[in-house]
Amino acid sequence: DLFRNFLDGIGILEKEEAAPEWISEIKMFDDIEQETKISEWQNKVEKIQSDIKCSQNKLADNMRLKSILYTSGDRLVEVVFEILEELMGCDLSGFVDNKKEDFLFEIDDNVFIGEIKGVRHNVKNENISQLDVHFQGYLDEHEEKDPNSVKALLIMNHQNNKAPEEREPVKDTQINLAKRNGSLIIETAVLLKLLEEYRSGKKTREMIINMIANSKGLLKLE
């Protein structure tokens, strides 16, 4: 580049003369046709780029929802809240965590109270017993409530260090304990399937609410 600049400086290299601005105004040959094609292609490219961005955003949202298969703590709770709100039409924005239950909401005459857990082990008796403590505590504070209208839910992302198909099923001991307590275990993988069926129209919100309100033990999709 230095040598080329030197030759240019002493006038050995011939400079290409710049085209004047007015030359682009002269339309000849197939100029107009080609400019029209370029404009159409640019519009198509912009539309494709917009569609790609839209699909990327949807994939990112799907990935966020699927995160309940491996997360725990606040991150898990936040996404589960979003799913519960969409599935059941509840509003958890005003829920205050008093270090008791993880969620509490009412739909018509039914009260749903529950725990959300992300753990590496399978469901344990202590998880179900802790849920029952919250259930009984709520009844103690609301003596006017019919116990049959209060539903205790244990939303579990158990064995979250494994892919769902590699996880051991919830054992009968824990399922029977949940049945005895009148509570319901909902695995996060099942919660995602419910959301998928709701969005596809296979299940309505009313069907989902009734299924959750009237099931005991371990929630299974019909």
For each feature predicted by the language model, list its residue ranges.
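Polar/charged alpha-helical tracts
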Residues: 5, 39, 206-210
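Catalytic core segments in nucleotide and nucleic-acid processing enzymes
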Residues: 59-222
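Interdomain/boundary linker segments immediately adjacent to catalytic/signaling cores
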Residues: 15-69
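A conserved amphipathic helix/loop scaffold
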Residues: 1-14
